Swiss-Prot record:
Residue numbers binding CoA: K58, F59, K60, R61, M62, C63, D64, K65, A311
Subunit structure: Homodimer.
GO molecular function: acyltransferase activity, transferring groups other than amino-acyl groups; naringenin-chalcone synthase activity
PROSITE patterns for the chain: CHALCONE_SYNTH (PS00441)
EC number(s) recorded for this UniProt protein: 2.3.1.74
The species this protein was found in: Oryza sativa subsp. japonica (Rice)
SUPFAM superfamilies in the cross-refs: Thiolase-like
Entry keyword set: Acyltransferase, Flavonoid biosynthesis, Transferase
Name this polypeptide is given: Chalcone synthase 1
Listed GO biological process terms: flavonoid biosynthetic process; polyketide biosynthetic process
Enzyme class: transferase
Superkingdom: Eukaryota
Length: 398
């Protein structure tokens, strides 16, 4: 009788050989585009707050300093007129918000996922795992289930739903997708972040200026990636390899960013020194990730940093002595889309690989080999993903 297979042999056969690789990226936004220059007038009019003249001036200054040119929002004037409680500062409105997001979050995620699947070019039946992340509402079965049904994925696709993580979670999604791809030979993971500000939109208040910071920064968007190890390069085109991924809670940062789901929707609280807390700890995060690789020149790597706001980017740049062009892709996404929470870093990855090809760089990482992706959010939590670019071949810009 043949000897039984050992557990070690089973594990070896289950694991992939190479690192997890980003094989495709897709992004989507609602059709409704909001220009930042016009937003203070619109916001105070739609929330019936035009009598708050001084507060409006403060909000205008927030918008002017945001370095955001435009954002996309599912909430149109018509929707807000139909839901006046969402326009008040603190009126019960969770049901109305939930009714919107449980439909629109999976729908926007589907639009991004379809683009990623089209670029990947393989049958949907090859998708083995689905990771879905949103901070916009909660439902059961979740947005992961809804998306799997909408896309016609196999009923035995392995799903993971992440609710209420916040702005660091684009990094979390990649970390989880990496582990799934590397520990399941042949796995192809569809990872989706979909965020809609219908949960956080509310009128202004003199007593809650940090809520107004959110009103000045947040936008809607969804992004999707296909992740897998050992790509079949006859039919799959790698974009970035994920070399390591880690998460940490910053010291002395409790309460710096909070979100609470209440009858009034998702309330947002922000301490003033979030940029300082992040910049103070950024060198340690970089050192932990790159010292094993013998890298200590932070201008020699490409950067994908969650653009929580311009002050975070400014202080990180100053702390580690970054050249301005290192954050070019990051600042472009902040300018053109605002802070889309978890989806931002995937938008930036997409922008980076496209711009690298258009500008004639040798690699998907602006001509550099190694790069870092940072997620920053409630906790304060920092996600750090070490990336390796791939060479750009002829036609890769298409």
């Amino acid at each position: 009788m043949a000897a039984a297979v050992t557990v070690e042999e089973v594990r070896r056969a289950q694991r992939a050989e190479g690192p997890a690789t980003v094989l495709a990226i897709g992004t989507a936004t609602p059709a409704n585009c909001v220009y930042q220059a016009d937003y203070p007038d619109y916001y105070f009019r739609i929330t019936k707050s035009e009598h708050m003249v001084e507060l409006k001036e403060k909000f205008k200054r927030m918008c002017d300093k945001s370095q955001i040119r435009k954002r996309y929002m599912h909430l149109t004037e018509e929707i807000l007129q139909e839901n006046p409680n969402m326009c008040a500062y603190m009126a019960p409105s969770l049901d109305a918000r939930q009714d919107i997001v449980v439909v629109e979050v999976p729908k926007l995620g589907k639009a991004a996922a379809q683009k990623a699947i089209k670029e990947w070019g393989q049958p949907r039946s090859r998708i083995t795992h689905l990771v879905f992340c949103t901070t916009s509402g909660v439902d059961m079965p979740g947005a992961d289930y809804q998306l799997a049904k909408m896309l016609g994925l196999r009923p035995n696709v392995n799903r993971l739903m992440m609710y209420q993580q916040g702005c660091f979670a684009g990094g979390t999604v990649l970390r989880v997708a990496k582990d799934l791809a590397e520990n399941n030979r042949g796995a192809r993971v569809l990872a989706v972040c979909s965020e809609i500000t219908a949960v956080t939109f509310r009128g202004p208040s003199e007593s809650h200026l940090d809520s107004m910071v959110g009103q000045a920064l947040f936008g809607d968007g969804a992004a999707a990636v296909i992740v897998g190890s050992d790509p079949d390069e006859a039919v799959e085109r790698p974009l970035f390899q994920m070399v390591s991924a880690s998460q940490t809670i910053l010291p002395d940062s409790e309460g710096a960013i909070d979100g609470h789901l209440r009858e009034v929707g998702l309330t947002f609280h922000l301490l003033k020194d979030v940029p300082g807390l992040i910049s103070k700890n950024i060198e340690r995060a970089l050192g932990d990730a790159f010292t094993p690789l013998g890298i200590s020149d932070w201008n020699s790597i490409f950067w994908v940093a969650h653009p929580g706001g311009p002050a975070i980017l400014d202080q990180v740049e100053a702390k580690v002595g970054l050249d301005k062009e290192r954050m070019r892709a990051t600042r472009h996404v902040l300018s053109e889309y605002g802070n889309m929470s978890s989806a931002c870093v995937l938008f930036i990855l997409d922008e980076m690989r496209k711009r690298s090809a258009e500008d004639g760089h040798a690699t998907t990482g602006e001509g550099m080999d190694w790069g870092v992706l940072f997620g920053f959010g409630p906790g304060l939590t920092v996600e750090t993903v070490v990336l390796h670019s791939v060479p750009i071949t002829a036609g890769a810009a298409a």
